[in-house]
Amino acid sequence: MTIPILTYHALNISGNDYATNDHVAFASDLELVTRAGWQIQPLHRIVDCLFDAGGTLPEKTIAFTFDDATDFDFADLPHPTAGPQRSMLNILRDFAAAHPGAQPGLHATSFVIASPEARAAMDRACIIDRGWMNDHWWPEAVASGLMGIANHSWDHNHECMARVAQRNQEKGNFFCIDTEADADAQIREAAR
């Protein structure tokens, strides 16, 4: 079974149309996949079913994820050039209110960067120190029933970090996380 997983970056905002704003794209894609007969399922359910011989999924199953877990995943925020942005969670809520029962499995998974130090460094280096990479919202997002939180990585292996979990201190992409030991280091650090 092939299952599409559509991924968005809530900080991907350079305008207010489909091609330049992942919030606009996500809201549009929710409508599109529903009209096309796809059934949205929580990513954790898909994984459970794929690894459990007794689990079943609808034939046209799809999942949604958000990468890097900025505060735009959870809260409506003003973008400095594109104006007010509806959060990914509130887009899910809006869809559920507009289409009651249309997607019983409505859910998205936000992949978070576990290290508070990495989030702070990335916020300073990549988001001009706007304070948009917090973890205070994670429990409330999960409690909504519409969003899950999963581990993206410990430190994003980001070049702005003084030290990363990667064994040779190679930074800038995930291609150098190429051994079980490096992957385990990311998981071990996140579990602390």
Report residues per predicted region:
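Active-site beta->alpha N-cap acidic-glycine motif
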Residues: I3, A10-L146, N157-H158
